Swiss-Prot record:
Signal peptide: none annotated. It is an enzyme of class 2 (transferase). Residues 246-318 are annotated as: Alpha C-terminal domain (alpha-CTD). Keywords: Chloroplast, DNA-directed RNA polymerase, Nucleotidyltransferase, Plastid, Transcription, Transferase. This is DNA-directed RNA polymerase subunit alpha. One of its GO terms (molecular function) is DNA binding. DNA-dependent RNA polymerase catalyzes the transcription of DNA into RNA using the four ribonucleoside triphosphates as substrates. Belongs to the RNA polymerase alpha chain family. The N-terminal domain is essential for RNAP assembly and basal transcription, whereas the C-terminal domain is involved in interaction with transcriptional regulators and with upstream promoter elements. The keyword Thylakoid does not apply. SMART domains: RPOLD. It catalyses: RNA(n) + a ribonucleoside 5'-triphosphate = RNA(n+1) + diphosphate. It is found in: Plastid, Chloroplast.
Length: 318
C-alpha cells in the first residue's frame, strides 16, 4: 500500500510546561522529513535557538567606594564578586533595543531581592524573588547598573572598561533566553522508511516561552534563506570576445611550446589559437603522440600569454 506523501514538514508542540518562573519547557515534532534531513534540521534549530535569539541582562555595575570585584562592602554578607554573580543571573525581558540604566538603593538590615531593582518601565523582571544579597547591618547598599540587549555569551569587556569610570565593574553577560536544547532523529516515520522526524526539546529562562523560541527561530531561518530564492542567472561571456578576434589568429609558434608539442599540433592541422579553441583539455590528449606534458604546455601557454582557459571536459559532438 502506497503512503500518501505530505508536501512539506510541519512543527507541532506535543508538550509544554512551566517548571518554575525561570524554567519553561517545550517539546516539538518536525515532520515529515526525507531521510538524512533530520540531523541537518536539528542542528540548524539548535544553533539558532542557542546562538541567535536576543535577550537582555545586566552587563556592568557601579557601587560607590568599590573599585574592583574582589572588594567587600561593610555590613553586606556577600563579597562584591558574589553580588555580581547574583546580578548576572537576574532574568529580564524587554522590547527595547536601547542600552538602559537602572539602580538599587536598600537600607539594611534587609534581604535584597530582584524586586528591589529600580528599572525603566520598558524592562520587566521574570522572577522578582531572585536573591541578590543580605545586608546585615544598618548600612545601605547602593548601585547603578547597565542593561543591554544582545545574543549568546559575552565576556567582560575589559578594554571597554578603560574608557569607563574607575568604579564600573563589567559582568560577563549571558543573553541567551534559551538555556538548553536537545534533539533526536527518529527514522521510519509513519511506517515509511524514506521519511523521518525530529523531536526538539527546548528549555528557556522564562523571558520567552519555548513556543516563542521556536517561532523566533523559524523566522530567523526563513530570513536567512529566503534571499537565496532569488537566484540570478549569470550569463557567461564567450571564451573569446569579438573584439579579441585578432588574438585568436595568433600562431601556435608564439605559445613557446616544446618541439614535440608544436609538431604534434601541426600534424593535427592546428596552426592558430583559433584552431585550439575547438579542443578541450581532454580532446588534446586524444591527439596522436600528444601526451599530458604537451597538453599542460598548451594550457599554460594559452593562460599565461593570452589569458585563455580551455575547458577541461571533452566537447560533445553532434
Amino acid at each position: 500500500m502506497a503512503h500518501q506523501r505530505i508536501v512539506g514538514p510541519t512543527i507541532e508542540c506535543i508538550e509544554s510546561r512551566i517548571e518554575s518562573r525561570r524554567n519553561h519547557y517545550g517539546r516539538f515534532v518536525i515532520a515529515p522529513l526525507e531521510i538524512g534531513q533530520g540531523i541537518t534540521v536539528g542542528n540548524v534549530f539548535r544553533r539558532v535557538l542557542l546562538g541567535d535569539l536576543e535577550g537582555a541582562c545586566i552587563t556592568s555595575v557601579q557601587i560607590p567606594g568599590v573599585n574592583h570585584e574582589f572588594s567587600t562592602i561593610h555590613g553586606v554578607r556577600e563579597a562584591v564578586l558574589d553580588i555580581l554573580l547574583n546580578l548576572k543571573e537576574i532574568v529580564l525581558k524587554t522590547q527595547s533595543q536601547e542600552t538602559q540604566r537602572g539602580h538599587l538603593s536598600v537600607q539594611g538590615p534587609s534581604t535584597v531581592l530582584a524586586r528591589d531593582l529600580q528599572l525603566p518601565s520598558s524592562i520587566e523582571l521574570v522572577d522578582p524573588d531572585q536573591y541578590i544579597a543580605t545586608i546585615s547591618g544598618r548600612v545601605s547598599l547602593n548601585m547603578e547598573f547597565t542593561v543591554e540587549v544582545g545574543k549568546g555569551y559575552q565576556l567582560p569587556d575589559y578594554e571597554k572598561k578603560k574608557t569607563f569610570q574607575v568604579d564600573v565593574l563589567p559582568i560577563d553577560a549571558v543573553f541567551m533566553p534559551v538555556t538548553k536544547v536537545n534533539y533526536t532523529v527518529e527514522e521510519n516515520y509513519g511506517g515509511d522508511r524514506s521519511q523521518e522526524r525530529v523531536i526538539i526539546e527546548v528549555w528557556t529562562n522564562g523571558s520567552i516561552n519555548s513556543r516563542q523560541a521556536i517561532d523566533l527561530s523559524v523566522n530567523k531561518i526563513i530570513n536567512l534563506f529566503s534571499p537565496l530564492q532569488n537566484v540570478r542567472s549569470i550569463e557567461h561571456e564567450p571564451l573569446v570576445k569579438e573584439k579579441d578576434s585578432k588574438m585568436t589568429e595568433v600562431l601556435v609558434e608564439e605559445l613557446d611550446l616544446s618541439v614535440r608539442a608544436y609538431n604534434c599540433l601541426k600534424r593535427a592541422q592546428i596552426h592558430t589559437v583559433s584552431d585550439l579553441l575547438s579542443y578541450s583539455q581532454e580532446d588534446l590528449l586524444e591527439i596522436k603522440n600528444f601526451g599530458r606534458r604537451s597538453a599542460e604546455e598548451v594550457i599554460e601557454g594559452l593562460q599565461k600569454r593570452l589569458g585563455i582557459h580551455l575547458p577541461k571536459e571533452k566537447f560533445t559532438k553532434d
